[in-house]
Amino acid sequence: MQFPMGPACIFLRKGIAEKQRERPLGPDEIEELREAFLEFDKDRDGFISCKDLGNLMRTMGYMPTEMELIELGQQIRMNLGGRVDFDDFVELMTPKLLAETAGMIGVQEMRDAFKEFDANGDGEITLGELQQAMQRLLGDKLTSQEISEVVQEADINGDGTVDFEEFVKMMSR
């Protein structure tokens, strides 16, 4: 039998990634956008042109296709009078930034995911807690035996539970 850790972890990572896409941008991300925007706002009037937007996106590592730029340009001309201010720029870039970082799981996201599994909040995930969480997340896709094997594999110290450190190691496999 193939070890079920892979599908369970992939599903959990996908769930965390979806939450990442729904979160607001953090102060560091907004500051990164502000610095990039100011670099292209040559006349310091608080606006950049459609053309500058494409170049700005490229300097930030996004490679919009010509079609995407045309669509953005039309949207900007129709809704924003042909120019983009910082707030509009943030609104345009937020989905791209969130999609880019969605696959990256940070410590806080790991803690949040761990708390989802640790139903009683004692700092350890028991077989029962994992079964409940997997049932919620995956439905009937994993059997009790498979879930038990997940705990056994993740339980490095052999105490029958998965602590946060073991959880992080399990998720990074």
Curated annotation (Swiss-Prot):
Binding site for Ca(2+) 1: D41, D43, D45, D52
Entries under SUPFAM superfamilies matching the protein: EF-hand
Tissues expressing the protein: Expressed in the retina (at protein level).
Domain EF-hand residue range list: 28-63, 82-99, 105-140, 142-173
CDD domains registered for this protein in UniProt: EFh
Record's keyword terms, sorted: Calcium, Cytoplasm, Metal-binding, Repeat
PROSITE patterns assigned: EF_HAND_1, EF_HAND_2
Chain sites annotated for binding Ca(2+) 2: D118, N120, D122, E124, E129
Binding positions (Ca(2+) 3): D155, N157, D159, T161, E166
Pfam families: EF-hand_7
Compartment annotation: Cytoplasm
Any one GO molecular-function label of the UniProt entry: calcium ion binding
Gene Ontology cellular component terms for the protein in this record: cytoplasm; cytosol
Top-level taxon: Eukaryota
Entry-linked Gene3D superfamilies: EF-hand (1.10.238.10)
Function: Inhibits calcium-dependent inactivation of L-type calcium channel and shifts voltage dependence of activation to more depolarized membrane potentials. Involved in the transmission of light signals. May positively regulate neurotransmitter vesicle endocytosis and exocytosis in a salt-dependent manner. May play a role in the extension and network organization of neurites.
Assembly description: Interacts with CACNA1C (via C-terminal CDB motif) in a calcium-dependent manner. Interacts with STXBP1. Interacts with MYO6.
Record protein name field: Calcium-binding protein 5
Organism: Bos taurus (Bovine)
Gene it is expressed from: CABP5
